[in-house]
């Protein structure tokens, strides 16, 4: 099964002290090839930015650098 390893940056939902202060959350996620476009739309709708997309072959969790 073809998998994409998507690294994205999303602003956090909680406000800290002031409205101007934002916390960003970086995460890496394995996404099946078929669902990759839907995942991209979800990240963009949350106001996030996709940093990197790589092709991770094989089974989920294999050869993807995720612990």
UniProtKB/Swiss-Prot annotation:
One of its GO terms (cellular component) is plasma membrane-derived thylakoid membrane. It is a peripheral membrane protein. Keywords: Antenna complex, Membrane, Photosynthesis, Phycobilisome, Thylakoid. Residues 1-56 form the CpcD-like domain. GO terms for biological process: photosynthesis. It is found in: Cellular thylakoid membrane. InterPro entries: Allophyco_linker, Allophyco_linker_chain, CpcD-like_dom. It comes from the Bacteria. The keyword Metal-binding does not apply. Belongs to the phycobilisome linker protein family. Rod linker protein, associated with allophycocyanin. Linker polypeptides determine the state of aggregation and the location of the disk-shaped phycobiliprotein units within the phycobilisome and modulate their spectroscopic properties in order to mediate a directed and optimal energy transfer. This is Phycobilisome 7.8 kDa linker polypeptide, allophycocyanin-associated, core. It comes from Synechocystis sp. (strain ATCC 27184 / PCC 6803 / Kazusa). The lineage of its organism: Bacteria, Bacillati, Cyanobacteriota, Cyanophyceae, Synechococcales. The gene is apcC.
